[in-house]
UniProtKB/Swiss-Prot annotation:
Gene3D superfamilies: Aspartate Aminotransferase, domain 1, Type I PLP-dependent aspartate aminotransferase-like (Major domain). PANTHER family: SERINE HYDROXYMETHYLTRANSFERASE, SERINE HYDROXYMETHYLTRANSFERASE 1. HAMAP family: SHMT. It holds the Pfam family SHMT. Keywords: Amino-acid biosynthesis, Cytoplasm, One-carbon metabolism, Pyridoxal phosphate, Transferase. This is Serine hydroxymethyltransferase. It catalyses: (6R)-5,10-methylene-5,6,7,8-tetrahydrofolate + glycine + H2O = (6S)-5,6,7,8-tetrahydrofolate + L-serine. GO terms for biological process: glycine biosynthetic process from serine; tetrahydrofolate interconversion.
Length: 427
């Protein structure tokens, strides 16, 4: 009888097997609304749990420092080719272990310590790697930050241009972790050209929407594009670097290896290749369109229930609830929805009076539950559940009712029904 990986795990380490099962059950029983999370396909999971994890493969396809890479080369080349096809890029490096690693490789290629970079303020929706003082990007480089308009809570390109003209950064960064609106990459390139800066687009959150043609494409306008491969792209956790400049591509490759990494994780790269193949199918565009439609349905019903949204809505997969009008902090709201098995995250909002550890916002996203098959009607119901819980924070009756409604949704849309690790009874 053929034994599966799960069989070996359960017999070798039942404690870990049981904890994995516990996490599987948690994912099944919760509404996952963290905007940066998603559920990969079973095929991606299989690729990541394969014998590819055994192979060291420093270098690039055809140029390895180790022997025995003939099949590894084919897998990585497939991932590269598919990434280039998805995004229309001339060059792709699929080796970065994460989006942060991808960004750091770009910095190593384009900058010297002490150079000036300019990105969005973290509290307005930016990312740690875009110059936050707690990140290496904020320690090695001079940093100036732009934000959103206090009136519209959206990007003001005239203000960004004025700041860029004053600060003269060597690298201008666009792309965000908590910005619910469309990004105009063409305007950013115009600003970058005017001040003689490189333009980096970090599309970690919107890569799947870009791949589906549902968000403007950064490739024609940006010197470099980085992304994670999970989130809306629905692949394994990892990073990706894209450019249409072949010479710059060579520098970027060297900045990944040997510049910032050693051996690539070829089992993860195989998972990336599988996910990229999935993203090339027509069904993925249908999925991405539903992600946006579901986020808008969630936003609309939250507003109908009296909750305020940053920028008054969303154009993509995420939205930010401004909780000040209901006298809650983001930390409190996060804890309240968690009591009814909804997973979200507290988040700063523009001009937030609270600390980053408390915040005034709650970030919500639609990708994961769209993967489970939920549509507009279900996201409207999710908005009602969230509203009921936040607007009646002290009601045990409401809490129990919300928990039952969450359970009903999870039961209707099962997650990974084929997965289970048999665990022997622990002594």
């Amino acid at each position: 009888m053929t034994r599966t990986n799960s069989d070996f795990l359960s017999s070798t380490d039942p404690a870990i097997a049981e904890l994995i099962n516990d996490e599987l059950q948690r994912q099944r029983d919760h509404l996952e609304l963290i905007a940066s999370e998603n559920f990969t396909s079973a095929a991606v999971l299989a690729a990541q749990g394969s014998v590819l994890t055994n192979k060291y493969a420093e270098g690039l396809p055809g140029k390895r420092y180790y022997g025995g890479c003939e099949y590894i080369d084919k897998i990585e080349q497939l991932a590269i080719n598919r990434a280039k096809q998805i995004f229309g890029a001339a060059h792709a490096n699929v080796q970065p272990h994460s989006g942060a690693q991808a960004n750091f490789a770009v910095f190593l290629s384009l900058l010297q310590p002490g150079d000036k970079i300019m990105g969005m303020d973290l509290s307005h929706g930016g990312h740690l790697t875009h110059g936050s003082p707690v990140n290496v990007s904020g320690k090695w480089f001079q940093v100036s930050h732009y934000g959103v308009s206090q009136q519209t809570e959206q990007l003001d390109y005239d203000q960004i241009r004025e700041l860029a003209l004053r600060e003269r950064p060597k690298l201008l960064i666009c792309g965000y972790s908590a910005y619910p609106r469309i990004i105009d990459f063409e305007k950013f390139r115009s600003i970058a050209d005017e001040v003689g800066a490189y333009l980096l687009a970090d599309i970690a959150h919107i890569a799947g929407l870009v791949a589906s043609g549902l968000h403007p494409d950064p490739i024609p306008h940006c010197h470099v594009v980085t992304t994670t491969t999970h989130k809306t792209l629905r692949g394994p956790r990892g990073g990706l670097i894209l450019t249409s400049d072949a010479e710059l591509g060579k520098k970027l490759d060297k900045s990944v290896f040997p510049g910032t990494q050693g051996g690539p994780l070829e089992h993860v790269i195989a998972g990336k290749a599988v996910a990229f193949g999935e993203a090339l199918k027509p069904e993925f565009k249908t999925y991405s369109a539903q992600v946006i439609e579901n986020a808008r349905a969630l936003a609309e019903q939250l507003q109908n229930r009296g909750l305020k949204l940053v920028s008054n809505g969303t154009d993509n997969h995420l939205l930010l609830v401004d909780l000040r009008s209901v006298n809650l902090t983001g930390k409190q709201a996060d804890q309240l929805v968690s009591t009814v098995n909804i997973t979200a995250n507290k988040n700063t909002i523009p001009f937030d009076p609270q600390s980053p550890f408390v915040t005034s916002g709650l970030r919500l996203g639609s990708p994961a539950m769209t993967t489970r098959g939920l549509g507009v009607a279900e996201f409207t119901e999710i908005a009602n559940i969230i509203s009921d819980r936040l607007l009646s924070p002290d009601s045990d009756v409401v809490t129990q009712d919300c928990r039952q409604r969450v359970a009903a949704l999870c039961d209707r849309f099962p997650l990974y029904p084929h997965l289970e690790i048999p665990v022997p009874a622990l002594a």
